[in-house]
Design a protein with these regions (language model features):
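Flavin-dependent oxidoreductase catalytic cores
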Residues: 1-2
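Short loop/turn motifs enriched for small/polar and acidic residues
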Residues: 77-79
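Active-site-adjacent loop and "lid" segments of alpha/beta metabolic enzymes
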Residues: 5-65, 81-167
Length: 167
């Protein structure tokens, strides 16, 4: 109605059960975002049996039960209820989610895990780490990225692709 092409609900459509009902009449994409807990609790000792498989199962269940519309984009929720190890596991094994048959969106831009690895305490000093993660994820087939420094990341992607194609 107001021109939106995409809805991104960080709760995975859990906070307001009527959200999906209201969206049914609109032919727009829905980002299925994973977050353990709530924004207030998500970083308080997040635990998983197996972070990769737990999130895969979360996506699979949501797709089957609530999101029959095929306009779905998957977001594993880097930094949303995950430790450094969880984030690295998700990034390094992201290609597993392709088997669900939907585009993947990842937001690593300026995330805490980059600062934990590089020592960059100011989030604005994490562009290099953001670019490194985006290029790795791109090499694994991720189609959509949420970033802050659009020009720098776009330039990095263009150069990366040119080098790969060697043309």
């Amino acid at each position: 109605k107001n021109g939106a092409d995409l809805i991104n609900d960080v709760s995975g459509f859990e906070y307001d059960p009527n959200t999906l009902l209201r969206l049914k009449k609109y032919n727009i994409s829905k980002v299925l975002h994973h977050m353990q807990g709530t924004p207030n609790t998500m970083q308080k000792n997040p635990k998983y049996k197996n972070v990769l498989l737990d999130i895969y199962d979360f996506f699979e269940l949501k797709i089957k039960k609530k999101l029959k519309n095929k306009k779905i984009i998957l977001d594993p929720g880097i930094g949303f209820g995950k430790t450094l190890k969880h984030n690295l596991t998700l990034i390094s094994k992201i290609s597993l989610f392709h088997s669900l048959g939907f585009p993947i969106l990842v937001g690593t831009s300026r995330k805490r895990f980059i600062g934990q690895i590089s020592g960059g305490h100011d989030s604005k000093d994490r562009t290099g780490g953001t670019l490194a993660s985006v290029l790795y994820l791109l090499s694994q087939g991720v189609q959509i990225f949420r970033v802050h420094n659009v020009n720098e990341i776009k330039q990095g992607i263009l150069v990366f692709k040119k080098i790969l194609l060697n043309q």
